[in-house]
Amino acid sequence: MNRHPGGEAQTLHLLEYVKLRKGMEALDLGAGEGETVRILKSLGINAHGVDLSPRSSDVETGNFLHLQYPSDSIDLCISQCAFFVSRDQKNALSECWRVLKKGGFLLLSDLDIGNLSEMAEQTGFTILRQENQTLLWREYYLEAIWNDSFCSEEYKLLQKEYKGKKLRYTMLVGRKE
């Protein structure tokens, strides 16, 4: 099972909105097994991954709410299905803003209670693209439950915490102007 809705195809879809250049510095936040890091490296990008519990040598131990990267040092921040689990999307967005260079990109697909785009704009990002991908997330969620996979316990906790709120899955492309 993929570690985020849409798997590699979704990662490549996010990357369609950025003109990638060899040598760009990219940071995958909540990188897990490093799938996205490896995709970026295969495209000539200097990619790094950060995760609280890395499951690959391509990913370093770290907290994307407190990144150990200098300000204005990254060209591209990408995160898929991770910010929401931190329960502090606002701080995660602020850390992306801090480490991104001017003109840098934020590529995000995550659970959303309806304010993700607004939070990104309040942080300073210009929103270039936004897509509702709730159907993709529902398919992923059902597969996770069916397979009793790694994320079903996390989702059960989130279900309790966000009971009664309308959740959707949003893809967002932003730029630090």
Predicted regions mapped to residue ranges:
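Conserved alpha-helix/loop element of class I SAM-dependent methyltransferases that forms part
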Residues: H4-K22
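Class I SAM-dependent methyltransferase SAM/SAH-binding core
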Residues: L27-H66
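A short acidic, Gly/Pro-enriched loop at the edge of an enzyme's catalytic core
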Residues: L65-C77
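A short SAM/SAH-binding and catalytic strip from SAM-dependent methyltransferases
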Residues: L76-D88
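A short glycine-rich, Lys/Arg-flanked "PGG" loop and its adjoining helix->strand segment in the class I
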Residues: K90-F105
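Short alpha-helix
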Residues: I113-G124
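Conserved Class I S-adenosyl-L-methionine
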Residues: E131-E177
